């Protein structure tokens, strides 16, 4: 999670670990550091990633991206912050968020397979009827991987070279340092919004958008450290997906995802490990977080579909609860009106000059140009002007001669006309008119000259209501919904989004049933946590869990006994004994102190979710009551002998008879009746955070194969706030799995994917630091 770079340097020298334990080792040379990145990193094991909100107090210590652009290259120097990035205490945009940082880690055991159905273009749109134009229809990468915006930092998990059982992030041993690495000195942040370095692959339209913004950032931050570009500590974007072909990498529709939020402050991340998927969406300005863990089974299509569509469906349902559209001002300001009027007058003059059959003299044209440019200077316009406007504002003598060699022409006729013109001014006005008319033609249909800047597609049609809408894209900004929130409506919105998403998935399964009947076998458990301020909304299906680590008062027998003795002593002092002098009590006597001793506190794990599996007697009873005619609905502690979970997303072969009948006989069940054997009805819960809550743990069921709730919280606390808690929990999981199998830690990791599923399941862990806790040092804070 990005510890200070000065504390990471000793960990590079892997050949002298024993010597470093007894004496401080010298810092390795720069060439040695570069050589440590020569070997490509294996991404099949998993990833470690973190997120730190850009709204955190940056005066405590610099962010990694800012720390390496200081003039003195000092890693501890707090750089001058960008204007507008720091919100004052009285700013209306400064919001209180219930979380401080996110630590995540994923480890895979199953083989990562490609999706069965690759094209889902119009299915989700028909099911959800979303006003945002459908869901994010594509996935993240072709294999185990992680992708996110600049506020997220990630690197693949690697075992230590000395077979010590400790993780590494790349060439750095993760047992000594936690979290992803920081960029090197002189490396300029490529983020234009969050100010945190980027260490995951980024492609598609979003990558082009960020590269265009890079020029602006270069103008503000000079490069220090020589002309030669230093190799970044994190892997380059092109080499992040090791061994993957570029054409096989499928990127998420980031523009559509950003459009659903309506703001540029959306920070997102998508990751996969085996059949597990993780999705994070953070709205920094609106102050809420969406975190989803999707634990798939029998194939990747169900969790992929959830990762592509569930967030957008829930976000659409939350309109009016968490966010709302800003109404456009119907009465523009006087300045804007004057600008439009002056531009209209200027265009009229240009048209008159271009269509005039009697060319004016150079002196008259110069005077006219002065009058036009002086009229435009009445109001200072900060907006960028068109090319023909800038050229027309220049003086005739100082302006660029557009016809010096008669080469500047839009056509052959223009060149001939310019050559026959009487004066240089006439040539210039003729060409400016052509340029202006050319730009005007682009705006006839109401679309801009560069449609890719605004995401306008050619196949979009203009809607009837044009208020704030251009080419089918709603230009109104989305803002945080003020006022109190009805928690029941929020939970209902989450449930509606899930219902619409599953309906779309089952419809897709039915459409491709003849060609891909195996899609009916695929399903997924899911866990979604929605946080807004101090309110947490949990939705789960299956056996994934959400825990809250909190301190509670531990009432021991000793503390109760001490309180009773104090009360008895006070009663004795209050008795009036006339035969004796009043008793003088020393205030230093702790036994009669008015204040009782502070109670002892203990860390407990509060489970916010409900398990849906055959291990829960209520779930088994429910299924048997729903299928009284089927005596074999639960076989071998599984639903129809197939699934351990009693509720799941997808898995249509246990929900619809026609989907079950399409399967091969070896996979087909004896379906009695038409009622589904498993449901997609989620468990919903609202929880209000308190000052005693330290962090929240979200994880798939693979974690609880070897760890209990209390052990998970205790392990996370060992590396909290000074380490990487999520990765520490994952490491302990693998250690216990290896110990149970009677093998070494590295022997377990040497087992290829697929075969390793015999010893442990795919596992994804998210540790969310809450507002009442300290943020861990490895996330870029020096406390």
From Swiss-Prot:
Q: What residue spans carry the region label Disordered?
A: 151-194, 555-595
Q: What tissues express this gene product?
A: Expressed in roots, leaves, stems, inflorescences, flowers and developing vascular tissue.
Would you identify the family this protein belongs to, as annotated? Belongs to the PP2C family.
Residue ranges of domain PPM-type phosphatase in the record: 260-770
Instruction: Report whether Manganese shows up as a keyword of the record.
Output: yes
Give the UniProt subcellular location, in the record's own words. Answer: Nucleus
Which terms does the record give in the GO molecular function aspect?
A: metal ion binding; phospholipid binding; protein serine/threonine phosphatase activity
Q: Name one Pfam family in it.
A: PP2C
Q: Write down the top EC class of this protein.
A: hydrolase
- What Gene Ontology cellular component terms go with this record? nucleus; plasma membrane
Q: Where does Mn(2+) 2 bind?
A: 295, 701, 761
Query: Which keywords label this protein?
Result: Developmental protein, Hydrolase, Magnesium, Manganese, Metal-binding, Nucleus, Phosphoprotein, Protein phosphatase
UniProt GO BP: maintenance of meristem identity; meristem structural organization; regulation of DNA-templated transcription; unidimensional cell growth
Question: How the cofactor binds, per note?
Answer: Binds 2 magnesium or manganese ions per subunit.
The UniProt function text for this chain reads: Involved in the regulation of pedicel length and of CLAVATA pathways controlling stem cell identity at shoot and flower meristems.
Essential cofactor(s): Mg(2+); Mn(2+)
Per its record, how is this protein called by name?
Answer: Protein phosphatase 2C 29
Phosphoserine is found on 199
Knocked-out gene: effects = Loss-of-function mutant pll1-1 (T-DNA insertion) shows suppression of clavata mutant phenotypes. Redundant with POL. Pol and pll1 double mutant inis seedling lethal.
Q: Where is the composition biased (Basic and acidic residues)?
A: 562-580
């Amino acid at each position: 999670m990005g510890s200070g770079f000065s504390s990471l340097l000793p960990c590079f020298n892997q050949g002298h670990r024993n010597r470093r334990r007894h004496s401080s080792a010298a810092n390795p040379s720069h060439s040695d550091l570069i050589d440590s990145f020569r070997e490509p990193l294996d991404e099949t094991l998993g990833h470690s990633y973190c997120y730190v909100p850009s709204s955190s107090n940056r005066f405590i210590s610099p962010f990694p991206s800012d720390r390496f652009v200081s003039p003195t290259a000092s890693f501890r120097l707090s750089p001058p912050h960008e204007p507008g990035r720091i919100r004052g205490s009285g700013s209306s945009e400064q919001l209180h968020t219930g979380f401080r940082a996110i630590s995540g880690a994923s480890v895979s055991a199953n083989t990562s397979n490609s999706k069965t159905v690759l094209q889902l273009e119009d299915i989700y749109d028909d099911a959800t009827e979303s006003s945002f134009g459908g869901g994010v229809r594509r996935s993240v990468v072709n294999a185990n991987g992680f992708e996110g915006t600049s506020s997220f930092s990630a690197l693949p998990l690697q075992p230590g070279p000395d077979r010590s059982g400790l993780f590494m992030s790349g060439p750095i041993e993760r047992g000594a340092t936690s979290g992803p690495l920081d960029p090197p000195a002189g490396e300029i942040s490529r983020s234009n919004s969050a100010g945190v370095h980027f260490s995951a692959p980024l492609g598609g339209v979003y990558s082009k958008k960020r590269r265009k913004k890079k020029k602006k950032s270069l103008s503000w931050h000079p490069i220090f450290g020589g002309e030669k570009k230093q190799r970044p500590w994190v892997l380059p974007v092109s080499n992040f997906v090791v061994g993957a072909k570029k054409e096989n990498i499928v990127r998420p529709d980031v523009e559509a995802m950003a459009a659903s939020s309506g703001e540029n402050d959306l920070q997102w991340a998508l990751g996969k490990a085996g059949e597990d998927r993780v999705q994070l969406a953070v709205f920094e300005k609106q102050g809420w977080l969406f975190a989803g863990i999707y634990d798939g089974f029998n194939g990747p299509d169900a969790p992929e579909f959830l990762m592509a569509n569930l967030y957008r469906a829930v976000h659409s349902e939350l309109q009016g609860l968490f966010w709302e559209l800003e109404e456009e001002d119907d009465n523009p300001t006087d300045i804007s009106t004057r600008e439009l009027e002056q531009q209209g007058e200027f265009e009229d003059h240009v048209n008159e000059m271009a269509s005039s059959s009697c060319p004016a003299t150079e002196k008259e044209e110069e005077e006219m140009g002065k009058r036009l440019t002086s009229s435009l200077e009445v109001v200072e316009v900060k907006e960028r002007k068109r090319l023909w406007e800038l050229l027309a504002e220049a003086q005739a003598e100082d302006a660029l001669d557009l016809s010096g060699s008669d080469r500047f022409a839009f056509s052959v006729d223009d060149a001939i006309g310019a050559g026959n013109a009487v004066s240089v001014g006439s040539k210039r006005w003729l060409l400016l008119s052509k340029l202006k008319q050319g730009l005007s033609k682009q705006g006839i249909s109401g679309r801009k000259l560069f449609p890719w800047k605004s995401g306008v597609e050619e196949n979009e049609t203009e809607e009837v209501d044009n208020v704030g809408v251009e080419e089918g894209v709603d230009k109104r900004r989305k803002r945080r919904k003020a006022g109190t929130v009805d928690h029941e409506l929020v939970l209902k919105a989450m449930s509606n989004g899930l219902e619409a998403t599953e309906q779309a998935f089952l419809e897709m399964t039915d459409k491709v049933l003849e060609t891909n009947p195996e899609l009916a076998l695929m399903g997924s458990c899911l866990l979604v946590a929605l946080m807004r301020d101090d309110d947490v909304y949990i939705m789960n299906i299956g056996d994934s869990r959400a825990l809250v680590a909190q301190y509670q008062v531990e009432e021991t027998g000793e503390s109760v006994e001490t309180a009773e003795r104090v009360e008895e002593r006070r009663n004795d002092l209050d008795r009036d004994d006339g035969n004796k002098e009043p008793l003088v009590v020393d205030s230093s006597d702790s036994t009669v102190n008015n204040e009782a001793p502070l109670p002892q506190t203990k860390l407990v794990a509060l489970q916010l979710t409900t398990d849906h599996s055959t291990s829960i007697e209520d779930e088994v009873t429910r299924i048997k009551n729903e299928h009284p005619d089927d005596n074999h609905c639960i076989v071998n502690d599984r639903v129809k002998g197939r699934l351990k979970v009693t509720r799941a997303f997808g898995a249509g072969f246990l929900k619809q008879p026609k989907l079950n009948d399409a399967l091969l006989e070896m996979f087909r069940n004896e379906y009695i009746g038409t009622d589904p054997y498993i449901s997609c009805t989620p468990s919903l819960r609202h929880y209000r955070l308190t000052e005693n809550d330290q962090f929240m743990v979200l994880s798939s069921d693979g974690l609880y194969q070897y760890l209990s709730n209390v052990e998970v919280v205790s392990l996370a606390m060992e590396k909290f706030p000074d380490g990487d808690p999520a990765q520490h929990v994952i490491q302990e999981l693998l250690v216990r799995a290896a110990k149970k199998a009677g093998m070494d830690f590295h022997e377990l990791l040497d087992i290829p994917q697929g075969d390793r599923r015999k010893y442990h399941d795919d596992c994804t862990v998210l540790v969310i630091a809450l507002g009442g806790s300290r943020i861990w040092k490895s996330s870029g804070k020096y406390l």
